[in-house]
Amino acid sequence: MAGKHSDDEDAYLYGSDDDNDQPVSKKQKITEQSDESQEKLSKTTAAKKSEVEEKDSLENSSNDEDDNDSEEDSDSDDDIEFVIGESAPKSGQTITTSGPQNDTIDAVTDMDAGGDKNATTTIVSNQADKGSSIDINSVAQLDGKPLTQVDLEKLKDKPWRFPGADISDYFNYGFDEFTWTAYCCKQDKLRGEFNPQKLMAQLMSGGAGPPPMPSGKSGSNNTPTNKPTAMSPPMGMPPMGMMPPGMPMMPGMPGMPGMPNMSNMPNMPNMPNMPNMPNMPNMPNMPNMNNMPNMPNMPNMPNFMNNSRPGQVPNFGIPPPPPPQNRR
């Protein structure tokens, strides 16, 4: 019994062999677990390292691409050439004309010979040949109707009556709706009354001649007669001051100014005492009227003018009329 107790005490105090074997197995388990954990750690670290390396490789590749792009940009920038002025003469020929220029291109011909293209451009100015196409005498039209005959009251829209509208945008020269209507009526009336062809026909027919001048009395009614004089125009011709504008001067008309060679007309007798008549050369002196051959002597005419005074009627030998009698 004593031996068992001692063994138990020794086992308790120092442990038994089984106990010594059991911790060894635990240590082995711990070492195995530690080995496994180390393997896991090594795997995780290896995975992390691989991820880091991949990231680094991606960053390096992106940096390399950026570097390549920058190098390409720099290379492309180096390839840029700045050319100032014309580097080569142009093959095209431009023909221009002097005078007012016109930007219209009339003809462009391309000549393809041997692969060379020479463009020939011809610029012809027709502005000098063409006159103005604006007729100042024509009346403007609105919807196919003369503007002076348009009734403003029949228009659907009257924008000049809108609030805030500027009337000068629709009527020029200070006109408004009412004054323009009056102006159009007056213009239509004047155009209807003034007909150049009708006026010319009246002048040629003698209807617009001067009023007759009383030159004498004939008959018992003492009506004045209009006798043609040397200075009056013939029938059917307008008087001197009433010639229409633009009518050419007709030759052979008596009393018309501006007739050339009036003094050199043949078979014109030398009329004495005519003012502004040039002296006719190689004309003999006219003898006295009383001593002209083959002419009877003219009787002495009474001197009526010697007894007259300024402002007094000459005495022709006719007794004066009797004084009026006072009638009571």
Swiss-Prot record:
It comes from the Eukaryota. It is found in: Nucleus. Residues 90-104 have a biased composition (Polar residues). Residues 29-58 have a biased composition (Basic and acidic residues). Transmembrane segments: none annotated. Residues 292-307 have a biased composition (Low complexity). InterPro entries: Fip1_dom (IPR007854), Pre-mRNA_3'-end_processing_reg (IPR051187). Pre-mRNA polyadenylation factor that directly interacts with poly(A) polymerase. This is Pre-mRNA polyadenylation factor FIP1. It comes from Debaryomyces hansenii (strain ATCC 36239 / CBS 767 / BCRC 21394 / JCM 1990 / NBRC 0083 / IGC 2968) (Yeast).
